[in-house]
């Protein structure tokens, strides 16, 4: 932990980090890293989990369904924030985040032994989603406790620096999950890893749980909470004080819309959406994609502490808003460049032989079927389903009513067919033939099934991914201190946890699912970026004009 001392001198030269403070930062951060590792394993393995737990639907639909299960954990995070936030404000910070880490570790380990769809049928995805819900509840109580605990140990003028170490934990947890997955995949080989080896990273959670519990048992309660408890000033009804009184509720709402919503979409775009874009859209080898993301996280992670420490000097608000604005302005050119350098064959094919679906819009359905029940049998739907499965970008061209949909690839036109009234056997024959014709035409036009490793410009892809991570560090590094400083100590755990987890659980957690559904519906591989851009712009506007700067506030007030 010598790095803690060396990096702490920038904003408060008269205070060096003592042994107790180092222990607080290290123990809180390490336990939270393990918890994020548990939570993000699922997202890192979403494509493999889709095959094991969501069988019976096409590859794209199964992946979107797996993303929905991933998002289920995010959906309940605000409820975890309410349940454990209340406990944290009533019984203490330390004991509450001990409970959360046990729930997280056990539920993650169970995923490692859970039979798949082929063994226990529909019970498999149901149990999986239940475990994701438990993970979400646990994480909903973890972050607010860790951030509050560390901030309440920090000396004045050092809260941004101290809490920035907590801010590294989500990215380090993701990095750790990718590293473990990469090691297992390399050791076992792709076939064995995808068959059964993917379970090993989940089972590792038992060991991490034991380490985390031991470390946290060594900690003392927050000095702010102890003093408040001794003076009888702790809240007896933190939920009522937080959300039933307008003077505090309006701060909660603004912390969400003018802070955590934008922070969340920048965070998930820069890490998870970027990973899924490499895997699903650019068809880069999973091992390579994970390595590139892990490399960008390794390079970018120190900037959490840099921006957190910088916020102690120049303020939290300006850095966070700058990150939102930079992300919104540059996302489109960055992701276009990722295509150009990550899979140049797709980029060139798009330029030389653009794909167009010529169809009557009345025949075209919304290409999003997470439960696998929709029947895409019109000529338009059949064409779009095949293109979506291959992640082929296409434009929509309106055709006259009554015409059969066509797919134009450069100068070549392939006619689809109407399958609505065909018998099952005839439909399969026609669809197989149409799929084969379309596949041949796409191949001749230069659209690859997978990215060619020899053509990928790895340094440029890594640079672009690192820029995305830098945006993440700008919005995320200072935000824990900002949230802690917005609320009084007696209801801090509850009040800060809810906007954080609605922002990150809902606005951010659903981003991959919503964005890929937007892509599947439109055929534009960049269309999903509108979601984070709009949210980031909203946060920047509200944050700049309505949110206060808090770096000089006294956080001991109750």
What are these regions (language model features)?
Residues 55, 102-121, 326-345, 444-452:
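C-terminal ends and interior cores of transmembrane alpha-helices
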Residues 42-43, 248-296, 334-335, 362-397, ...:
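Extracytoplasmic gate region of multi-pass secondary transporters
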Residues 114, 120-140, 348-359, 458-474:
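Hydrophobic core of transmembrane alpha-helices in multi-pass small-molecule transporters
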Residues 67-86, 105-107, 172, 294-307:
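Central cavity-lining transmembrane alpha-helices of secondary-active solute carriers
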Residues 46-77:
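Extracellular/periplasmic helix-loop-helix junction of adjacent transmembrane segments
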Residues 138, 160-185, 208, 334, ...:
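Glycine-rich segments within core transmembrane alpha-helices of 12-TM secondary carriers
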Residues 336-463:
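Low-complexity, proline/glycine-enriched hydrophobic segments characteristic of transmembrane helices
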Residues 90-102, 313-324:
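Cytoplasmic membrane-interface "Motif A"-like loop-to-helix N-cap segments
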